């Protein structure tokens, strides 16, 4: 993933003071979550730049090699082994380049939030375990840590434990709820503050979830 990622950008007002970089799930693209921005916004919030990158197109092993947009290859059904580690690492690096671009525009890391759904969430959580950047927070929707054992053994940089909003469907057939619960447990053990939500839905996003996420974002923006 040596080329810069193409992105969809939505600025809520001129001169953004904050940025949210939001990664989509397998087979989707950067347009997938762009429509929810108006559902999250509160009138008193500062200007925010939402950045929705497109993942590169690549063959996906579990889907018989059919090419689609993906942050990494999925090798099988076993959640302990399914993620292509090199692909995850490459996407973490590409995400870092997006963060650097926002910093270059004048938004400090302390005012940048990372969000991701499914595969996208797996990438932002993996990044949080590797980076020493003081990111403002993580939004992990219907997702998991690709290498849970490695995460459990991780040594997170001192003080670099941003707050995490996690939400998951109780009837998710793609990423079972138990896998997400295990991920939340490991993150808590590592010292990440977790706000956890579970909803009676499948592999999706619901209105109640967006309301809770808006409340969480409100607290993050007010704390700065």
Task: List each language-model region with its residue ranges.
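Serine-hydrolase catalytic machinery in alpha/beta-hydrolase-like enzymes
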Residues: 2-113
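Short helix-capping segments at alpha-helix termini
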Residues: 41-46, 106, 131-134, 188-192, ...
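Alpha/beta-hydrolase-fold catalytic nucleophile elbow
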Residues: 53-54, 115, 139-142, 167, ...
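Short alpha-helix in the alpha/beta-hydrolase fold that links the catalytic acid
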Residues: 33-38, 152, 176-186
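Primarily recognizes the serine-hydrolase "nucleophile elbow" in alpha/beta-hydrolase
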Residues: 103, 108-159
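C-terminal catalytic histidine-bearing segment of alpha/beta-hydrolase fold enzymes
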Residues: 178-224
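Short, proline-enriched alpha-helix->beta-strand connector loops that line the catalytic pocket
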Residues: 159-164, 190-193
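Short beta-strand/loop motif that positions the catalytic acidic residue
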Residues: 166-168, 172
């Amino acid at each position: 993933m040596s080329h810069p990622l193409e992105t969809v950008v939505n600025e809520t007002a001129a001169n953004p003071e904050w940025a949210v970089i939001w990664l989509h799930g397998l087979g989707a693209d950067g347009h997938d979550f762009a429509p929810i921005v108006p559902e999250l916004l509160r009138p008193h919030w500062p200007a925010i730049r939402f950045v929705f990158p497109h993942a590169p197109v690549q063959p996906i092993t579990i889907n018989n090699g059919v090419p689609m947009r993906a942050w990494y290859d999925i090798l099988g059904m076993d959640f302990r082994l399914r993620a292509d580690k090199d692909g995850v690492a490459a996407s973490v690096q590409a995400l870092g380049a997006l963060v650097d671009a926002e910093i270059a525009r004048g938004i400090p890391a302390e005012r940048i939030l990372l969000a991701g759904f499914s595969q996208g969430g797996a990438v932002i959580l993996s990044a949080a375990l590797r980076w020493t950047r003081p990111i403002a927070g993580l939004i992990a929707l219907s997702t998991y840590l690709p290498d849970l054992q490695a995460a459990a053994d991780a040594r997170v940089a001192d003080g670099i434990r941003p707050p995490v909003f996690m939400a998951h469907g109780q009837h998710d057939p793609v990423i079972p709820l138990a896998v997400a619960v295990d991920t939340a447990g490991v993150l808590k053990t590592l010292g990440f503050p977790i706000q956890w939500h579970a909803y009676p839905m499948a592999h999706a996003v619901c209105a109640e979830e967006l309301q809770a996420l808006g409340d969480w974002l409100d607290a993050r923006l007010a704390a700065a």
